[in-house]
Amino acid sequence: MKHAFSIRTLLAALIAALLSFPVYADKVYDTDIVVVGGGGTGLAAGVQAKMLGAEVIILEKQAIAGGSANYAEGIFAAESTMQKRQGIDVSRKFAFHAIMNYSHWRANAPLVSAIVLKSAETLEWLQQFGVNYEFIGVGAFGGPLTWHVVGELEINGKRYNHGSAVMAALNQKFRDLGGTILLQTPGKKLIKKDNRIVGVEGVNKDGEKVIVNAKAVIIGTGGYGNNKEMLKKYARFPDVIMVGQAGKDGEGIQMAWEAGAGEEGAEIMIPYRPGLPDFSTTSHLIAAAVQPYLYVDPNGRRYTDEHNISEWPFSGNALERIGGVAYSIYDEQTRQLFLNDGIQMALGEWVIYGTKLDKLDEEFNKELAKNNGNVFKCNTIDEVAQKIGADPKVLKETIANNNKAAAIHKDEQFFKNADFLRPVEKGPFYVTKLQPRALGTFGGIRINEKTEVVTAQGKTIPGLYAGGLDAGGMYGDSYGLEMGGASFAFALNAGRIAAENAVKYIK
């Protein structure tokens, strides 16, 4: 017995010794702050931390930095210098209450306040790196003027516009300040010691294990829009078409959860205009289909005020409610309108108001030839009904009501703006399937107003920060478009706030 006990003791000692050895890595780096993700949150955090004197390494999964922020168009701000010069009255008080009321006060009020209060300062902070703003627009039709659309910028002989201009400017500034970006090196796991986060494990493009030892970690990996398992588990509508989500696999969220982070907002998405898979934001086929004229469900009935397409969350929620499939129907007269006069409703800066859809026929006929059920060209309403699986009587009644509304300039069912009432009268009739699309997920990691990651009970996890699409709390159950540019602003401002607090923490 005595011998057996000594063997067990020896084995226990050996195991303890092995566990105390440093984790093996092919490459090891030491820094003050490591940022996981080189998008809007990550680059803003990296530049801000460097400007405050910290040494910073950014781990970026893709071959280029910027992430989906490269495709943003404008940035939210309240009480900006540009707004004041133009006599635009959008106070911080108004913006804060608008965001909170939209969420029915389910959003994290201290966090929302912190973002709103910093928003104007961040616009001017970016200007010192060459970023400029073309104009101030609205997010949703009739909304407040908060969307500061970014203008063109030239860096090293290459021209950038909109979000890519901001990302290029931050990328250049970060490198000028001596920051290090490890491209094609995703973070995989947080390193925790004595209940503090002290680094990140990652893997580079050669499959080598990389360890970055740091005093603080900032997470901003862009959500989980490319992770089908997470979509199935958390998204309200997991079959949504995700737009521009390459590499967004949720690693940042998962590593934070594994380290004890609370969960918040994992189910929230950034709904986009309905459309079809594999069509770009500049598609003329989609631009025609989403004009707010006549949408029907698979039974042939109107289900919404079509003009709510101008506020994506509304159109996404309405489409989700009926099962995720609808059909846009317009006639030959409306097709001619698209070709000769242009569209009535812009698709952001991608297809602007009045654009003549000269690529519509080419795109439509190409999709029609695939015979995949996405588009139909029909000579009669009976044929339209047959193609979408609706009762012809029901569809004919819907169209008759639509045509009556167009004739009297009054929608007596959903009270749509009369400017968008158009008849469907003379064939051929053009039908396009509409399915839910999203520009990403928006939540997962619970944070406080300092962007410190917290547990489900609200206790901070020392040394860990998060922002952008990985972080929850900015919205309630639906992303809001009324404050134009809010998601880009959240990424940039959260990154700066995280950097400021991380630098204070490590000192």
Kindly label every feature range from the protein language model:
Residues 51-71:
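Glycine-rich FAD pyrophosphate-binding loop
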Residues 77-114:
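Glycine-rich active-site loop/strand segments that organize a redox cofactor
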Residues 9-20:
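Bacterial N-terminal signal peptides
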Residues 114-208, 228-229, 399, 405-426:
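Conserved redox-cofactor binding core of oxidoreductases
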Residues 27-41, 57:
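Beta1/beta-strand and adjacent pyrophosphate-binding region of the FAD-binding site
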Residues 253-255, 262-387:
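An anion/pyrophosphate-binding glycine-rich loop and adjacent beta-alpha core
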Residues 205-282, 482, 488-497:
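Glycine-rich loop(s) and the adjacent beta-strand/alpha-helix scaffold that form part
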Residues 189, 394-478, 482:
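A glycine-rich dinucleotide-binding beta-alpha-beta segment and adjacent secondary-structure elements
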